[in-house]
């Protein structure tokens, strides 16, 4: 699934570096998990925890992990517009379909930034396949929907954090990080 800043191309290299000094059984924390690409590439040799502040995204990850999320068989511009309206009206809504459309079927993976469609690319298929590939790597992961700052005292082990940076494109689905 496309996601602005999702690290899809770099995830395996980042995970190799993060895992390099991690010992067996050591907890791993991804404090701004976003699309979960780095998380999916981390070895499962200890407890894994993933944190994000976007309720529908966290629920989508949980449902993918548990094998209960069913992607739509077809996607339309009208459904995208209706879900966008719903997401803007209720930013705390945890419907995983909002995350699927809002990131996976939006231009460049940017939260409801225009419906992504092209005769040359199957966005629905790509988002569906991308999530299916994460089911196995997400097994056993604890997903938390909280600001990472609120759980720092309970974090131990290896930590990966790549928060949104000041002066870059913001995340409309999340409150400002700066």
Residue spans for each PLM region:
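Class I S-adenosyl-L-methionine-dependent methyltransferase catalytic core
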Residues: 1-178
